[in-house]
């Protein structure tokens, strides 16, 4: 993606054009990771229900995904729902899952149009069947895309990933003496992808 590519799709004289002209396209990160946090605080500051904060967060996801794809970012990972999030009220968790399903239904065509490949990282097998179905459909339909890799971390925990990676390594029959950082990375959810260059917590 070049400056001219960006300028061809943003309105002349717009804030987007001004911002694009400030970007160093030669120094863009290969992998951006975003920890989605603060939706509740955003809503509280505006005296709105927490659900409105989550809805606003979904809108931000749309902008981040499309913007990253237009910039030519190779990998975008959104940490959306951690294993600790199950401790939230049942109604809030249900709302989050409903918003996730709605996003996937509404944005699948956008992912396809922008050649974005979708992948879930985390313990997706522990999610509700209807949620797993939507996630699987999005993965299947975008599997042949060759543009940006879009990972969404659901029911994810860093320690849980390390434990699962260790189990997969042991199951593979690898000699412990041969296991180094590079070989271990082959058992992570993001195997074959570059490590994040930029981590943003919202």
Language-model regions, residue ranges each:
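Flexible, compositionally biased loop and terminal segments
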Residues: 1-202
């Amino acid at each position: 993606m070049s400056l001219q590519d960006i300028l061809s799709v943003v309105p002349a004289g717009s804030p987007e054009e001004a911002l694009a002209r400030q970007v160093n396209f030669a120094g863009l990160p290969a992998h951006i990771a975003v920890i989605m946090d603060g939706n509740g605080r955003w809503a509280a500051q505006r005296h709105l229900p927490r659900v409105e904060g989550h809805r606003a967060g979904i809108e931000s996801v749309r902008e981040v995904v499309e913007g990253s794809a237009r910039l030519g970012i190779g990998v975008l990972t959104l940490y959306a729902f951690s294993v600790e999030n199950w401790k939230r009220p049942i109604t809030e968790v249900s709302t989050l899952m409903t918003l996730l399903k709605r996003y996937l239904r509404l944005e699948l065509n956008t992912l396809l149009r922008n050649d974005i490949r979708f992948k879930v990282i985390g313990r997706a097998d522990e999610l509700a069947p209807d949620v797993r179905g939507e996630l699987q459909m999005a993965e299947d339909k975008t599997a042949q895309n060759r543009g940006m890799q879009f990972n969404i971390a659901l029911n994810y925990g860093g320690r849980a990933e390390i434990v699962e990676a260790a189990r997969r390594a042991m199951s593979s029959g690898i000699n412990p003496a041969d296991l180094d950082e590079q070989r271990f990375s082959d058992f992570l959810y993001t195997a074959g992808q570059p490590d994040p260059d930029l981590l943003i917590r919202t």
